[in-house]
């Protein structure tokens, strides 16, 4: 069986053993407890000029994350092109990685848009 997923060396195949060090356990716990830490250190976005870069959130994006954590129902009334989708997708990624047995759906006005967000 291959050790990578679909030939990507950054992704392990199903059933591969992972060795945990004391440091990696502490980092995992920190990511689990703090979505903002996880997003700023492990989520990457594509920049037009610079390519793949870290997702450095603005204060209003950090406030969005904290609102998602503290409130069950959230409506964000914001203008276009402010990073809402990236912020929400980053939070959802944290949510599905660090919570057991959860379902997540991405809805958009077109199928292509929903797929792009994934």
What are these regions (language model features)?
Residues 2-118:
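Phosphate/NTP-binding elements of NTP-utilizing enzymes
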């Amino acid at each position: 069986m291959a050790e990578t997923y679909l030939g990507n060396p950054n992704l392990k195949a199903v059933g591969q053993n992972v060795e945990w060090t004391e440091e990696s356990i502490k980092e995992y716990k920190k990511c689990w407890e703090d979505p903002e830490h996880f997003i700023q250190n492990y989520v990457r976005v594509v920049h037009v000029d610079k390519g793949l870069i870290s997702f450095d959130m603005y204060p209003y994006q950090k406030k969005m994350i904290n609102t998602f954590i503290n409130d069950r129902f959230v409506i964000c009334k914001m203008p276009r092109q402010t990073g809402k989708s990236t912020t929400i997708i980053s939070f959802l990624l944290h949510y599905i990685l660090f919570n057991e047995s959860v379902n997540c759906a991405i809805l958009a006005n077109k199928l292509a848009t929903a797929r792009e967000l994934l």
